[in-house]
């Protein structure tokens, strides 16, 4: 059971496992799970790719900022954020000040494997890739831009590369106990 900090926010690049790990972590801690991308889809009634196409990245990021503001005010949650949510200084501020931020870190090689066939990610659409030689180049640019922002607000960093989901969740639980964020069982 969490003590003072009953809010856990997962950040990191696409393909790091935020949604999958977040669901299991929430279940283990008996907390409610939210995914900011799914919440945007619920609010708009369309998928995030459509929002990206119609409103552009700026419109999408504005929606994302509002959703993160709302969700970070909830109690007893695990929140999986979109990979680009940290681009907004307002969203970063909400995440950093309102809960415990866990940076799920992964390599570009793992991102390539995990996102290869994913059609739901707006940044992986061919129109975005138009300016890049390949997906690796895009992911490298995103990493250069975003990794320092993930590191800036994270309380805990966990690599998801060589571990199963269960193993990563267990690792997070150990770190939460070590940091005094949850009672020892």
From Swiss-Prot:
Cytoplasm is among the record's keywords: yes
Summary of the function given for this chain in its UniProt record: Catalyzes the specific phosphorylation of the 3-hydroxyl group of shikimic acid using ATP as a cosubstrate.
PANTHER family cross-referenced by the UniProt entry: SHIKIMATE KINASE, SHIKIMATE KINASE 1, CHLOROPLASTIC
Binding site for substrate: 37, 61, 83, 146
Enzyme Commission number(s) of this protein: 2.7.1.71
Pathway: Metabolic intermediate biosynthesis; chorismate biosynthesis; chorismate from D-erythrose 4-phosphate and phosphoenolpyruvate: step 5/7
GO cellular component: cytosol
GO molecular function: ATP binding; magnesium ion binding; shikimate kinase activity
SUPFAM superfamilies attached to this UniProt entry: P-loop containing nucleoside triphosphate hydrolases
Catalytic activity: shikimate + ATP = 3-phosphoshikimate + ADP + H(+)
UniProt entry tagged with the keyword Ribosomal protein: no
Keyword annotations of the record: Amino-acid biosynthesis, Aromatic amino acid biosynthesis, ATP-binding, Cytoplasm, Kinase, Magnesium, Metal-binding, Nucleotide-binding, Transferase
Species whose genome carries this gene: Blochmanniella floridana
Entry cofactors: Mg(2+)
Record's subunit section: Monomer.
InterPro entries, per the entry: P-loop_NTPase, Shikimate/glucono_kinase, Shikimate_kinase/TSH1, Shikimate_kinase_CS
Cofactor stoichiometry and binding remark: Binds 1 Mg(2+) ion per subunit.
Class of enzymatic activity (EC top level): transferase
Record's protein name: Shikimate kinase
Gene Ontology biological process terms from the UniProt entry: amino acid biosynthetic process; aromatic amino acid family biosynthetic process; chorismate biosynthetic process
Pfam families with a match to the protein in the record: SKI (PF01202)
Gene3D superfamilies: P-loop containing nucleotide triphosphate hydrolases
Compartments (UniProt record): Cytoplasm
Positions contributing to ATP binding: 15-20, 121
Binding site for Mg(2+): 19
Organism classification: Bacteria, Pseudomonadati, Pseudomonadota, Gammaproteobacteria, Enterobacterales
């Amino acid at each position: 059971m969490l003590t003072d900090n009953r809010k856990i926010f997962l950040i990191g690049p696409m393909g790091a496992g935020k949604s999958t790990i977040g669901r299991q972590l929430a279940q283990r801690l008996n907390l409610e799970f939210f995914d900011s991308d799914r919440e945007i889809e619920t609010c708009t009634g369309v998928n995030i790719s459509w929002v990206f196409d119609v409103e552009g990245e700026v419109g999408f990021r504005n929606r994302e900022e509002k959703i993160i503001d709302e969700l970070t005010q909830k109690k007893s949650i695990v929140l999986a954020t979109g990979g680009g949510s940290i681009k907004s200084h307002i969203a970063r501020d909400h995440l950093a000040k309102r809960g415990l931020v866990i940076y799920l870190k992964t390599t570009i090689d793992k991102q390539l494997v995990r996102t290869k066939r994913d059609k739901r990610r707006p940044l992986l659409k061919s129109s975005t890739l138009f300016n890049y030689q390949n997906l690796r180049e895009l992911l490298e640019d995103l990493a250069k831009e975003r990794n320092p922002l993930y590191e800036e607000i994270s309380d805990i960093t966990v690599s998801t590369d060589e571990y199963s989901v269960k193993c990563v969740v267990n690792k997070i639980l150990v770190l939460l106990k070590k940091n005094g964020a949850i009672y020892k069982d």
